[in-house]
């Protein structure tokens, strides 16, 4: 469930609110694989996939393909203390850029921001309770879609994952 939460949260942060999903689950060779077609409030379409357990150096991330360029991002296990890799491709000038994150260890930065919000009252710039609820609603919709084999609107879901 935690991995699904991360996948849903990534998509919501990158493309906006998810309104509906159509999902399937495949269980083979000791792996569980979710494949999810996603509809966003903006009208954009997306695809989520999650495989557990993978036979490789695990990472999570996202890929966005647009009219004027693309972004590919990878985030690694937090215990590696490794910055995320973000590549930006710009159609306008045919360039490729890799963002260097000298201080980009995401997990440490999230913990520091959380502690700062609690200890000093700093504004929360990370996910909040509404983001968490939207992520859980997305996971419930994915579970219901796997069960029914059909499209599920997030606004219509209730119950546990």
Regions found by a protein language model. Name each.
Residues 1-79, 108-122, 139-142, 159-161:
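Contiguous beta-strand/loop segments that form the cofactor/metal-binding neighborhood of enzyme cores
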Residues 62, 78-92:
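Short polybasic amphipathic segments
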Residues 38-42, 87-94:
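Short acidic, glycine-rich loop/turn motifs
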Residues 91-161:
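C-terminal helical cap and adjacent loop that interface with cofactors, partners, or active-site loops
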């Amino acid at each position: 469930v935690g991995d699904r939460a991360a996948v849903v949260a990534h998509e919501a942060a990158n493309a906006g609110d998810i309104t509906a999903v159509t999902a399937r689950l495949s269980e083979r060779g000791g792996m569980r694989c979710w494949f999810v077609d996603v509809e966003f409030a903006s009208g954009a379409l997306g695809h989520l996939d999650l495989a557990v357990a993978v036979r490789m150096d695990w990472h999570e991330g996202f890929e966005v393909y647009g009219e004027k360029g693309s972004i590919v991002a990878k985030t690694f296990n937090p215990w590696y203390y490794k910055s995320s890799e973000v590549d930006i491709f710009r159609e306008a000038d045919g360039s490729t850029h890799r963002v260097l994150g000298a201080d980009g260890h995401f997990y440490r930065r999230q913990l520091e921001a959380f502690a700062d919000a609690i200890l000093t009252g700093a504004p929360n710039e990370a996910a909040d309770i509404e983001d968490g609820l939207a992520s859980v609603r997305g996971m419930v919709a994915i579970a219901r879609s796997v069960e029914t084999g059909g499209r599920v609107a997030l606004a219509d879901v209730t119950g546990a994952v």
